[in-house]
Amino acid sequence: MPARISRATYAQMFGPTVGDKVRLADTDLIIEVERDLTTYGEEVKFGGGKVIRDGMGQSQLSRAEGAMDTVITNALILDHSGIYKADIGLLDGRIALIGKAGNPDTQPGISIIIGPGTEIIAGEGKIVTAGGIDTHVHFISPQQVDEALNAGITCMVGGGTGPAHGTLATTCTPGPWHIARLIQSFDGLPMNIGVFGKGNASLPGALEEMVRAGACGLKLHEDWGCTPAAIDNCLSVADHFDVQVAIHTDTLNEGGFVEDTLNAFKGRTIHSFHTEGAGGGHAPDIIRVCQYPNVLPASTNPTRPYTVNTIAEHLDMLMVCHHLSPAIPEDIAFAESRIRKETIAAEDILHDMGAFSIISSDSQAMGRVGEMIIRCWQTADKMKKQRGSLPDDRPGNDNYRARRYIAKYTINPAIAHGMAHEIGSVEVGKRADLVLWNPAFFGVKPDMVLLGGWIATAPMGDANGSIPTPQPMHTRPMFGSFGKALTNTSITFVSQAAMDEGLREKIGVDKQLVAVVNTRGGIGKHSMILNNAMPQMEVDPETYEVRADGELLTCEPVDVVPMAQRYFLF
């Protein structure tokens, strides 16, 4: 005879189910469970006196007979594709199945087999997301990887050589020698990583050798001369090798105006960095490029969201990052031309409209690598408070908005850089790069981060304690961050040309190399999931006012944001 229990009791035991609502951290964002792939009365749970025991929820089947390596039980999945409850089966470091786990000999409707060789991660009451992807990383210090991983980032794409002045300002690794050294260093870093080569050249030869040396993309930056000739040449090389181009355009409009840059694109796909302009780009109207079908517009977290401190913070950051001198009036003018409250305010709204598609960090070069996810959700919360529910949201939840914002740092950067066949979503067949969150700490401090199906980092107490929880409790590297487990659970993204030339053997790295694919004409703004709006943009050159489809885009800065100081008292 079936038993009945209250929703509260059920949620406490097995996590929320259809119709239950969950608040994300201390924001005003509420998600609601849309569907539940588990079976009421047949839920699996690990523990003393619980279901996953021999002959009950655990079968006799071996790995060779279909049992999983790991099962995450009763997880609430938050993904661009939906918000739903399920068990997740992991095999060979990938997501093998999403559905109902258990013992097919004793339970009905089992698609995910638990056997004696299966580890269990308790997902009850936890939110599971795909690992974050940060596509704007200045590789200034290797310690960034620790900060990013501990914040829920599992893939970093960018360039640099360390604290060299070229790297402090620009996100690119110049030349095959530097690219080889950087890729070799990745064998010691628990992170999926891709490298941008320098894209600033008017002839193809030097760019071609960087792509063959392992660059998974090319970066055009104004500090190296972002002229129409360099843009055209870089995109031509990218088209030939199927790698993405990222661009930071000409703030001073020396080599041309935004129209000249757009003409140099010639309709070819390009990833536009900090499209708002405070991070750099044609002043004051680079923001206009988000209206074009070939531009994949992104912005970085220094301006996310617009607060009372945003403007004041930026001037000093710019002076340091771009090797400027406060004693030179022209340097001051350069910095001030990039900081416009009108376009920063519009940036908030364009993200909420889905006209800006990607959020990234700009790590240690104005942005904070460990705050990319936080800043994304702070923006979503600010926009809900100021603009109300989105038209596509149903009464009582913010599911559509949540899916739109999580897409900005998961699936969309993966699509933009040809990595979506491996990462970017909670999807069968993809790498098990997953993050578990306690809802109260969502987006701020993960409960666990998996790389390639293996735990890489997690909160942990005193290692000499009798249990795992005695203070000091803080995030620490786990076994997935050491030895050959590290090189067998994370990958390096490179070009197909580098794969064809045997780069792994040539430079002697242990990590698996994976080629990026479909970065050019096969994708465009239409490919940016839930973030493909292309409004007609106008920027007043005198007042800097921004309009989309004739509507003035403006909002007030906030003086309080969620996911902030209350989470970082210790």
UniProtKB/Swiss-Prot annotation:
Cofactor note: Binds 2 nickel ions per subunit.
Cellular compartment(s): Cytoplasm
Residues annotated as binding substrate: 221
Positions with a binding annotation for Ni(2+) 1: 136, 138, 219, 362
Annotated keywords: Cytoplasm, Hydrolase, Metal-binding, Nickel, Virulence
Pathway: Nitrogen metabolism; urea degradation; CO(2) and NH(3) from urea (urease route): step 1/1
Free-text description of this protein's post-translational modifications in UniProt: Carboxylation allows a single lysine to coordinate two nickel ions.
SUPFAM superfamilies in the cross-refs: Composite domain of metallo-dependent hydrolases, Metallo-dependent hydrolases
Presence of the UniProt keyword Hydrolase in the record: yes
GO MF term list: nickel cation binding; urease activity
Residues recorded as bearing N6-carboxylysine in the entry: 219
PANTHER family: UREASE
Function, as annotated: May protect brucellae during their passage through the stomach. The major route of infection in human brucellosis is oral.
The protein's assembly and partners: Heterotrimer of UreA (gamma), UreB (beta) and UreC (alpha) subunits. Three heterotrimers associate to form the active enzyme.
Protein name as catalogued: Urease subunit alpha 1
Name of the encoding gene: ureC1
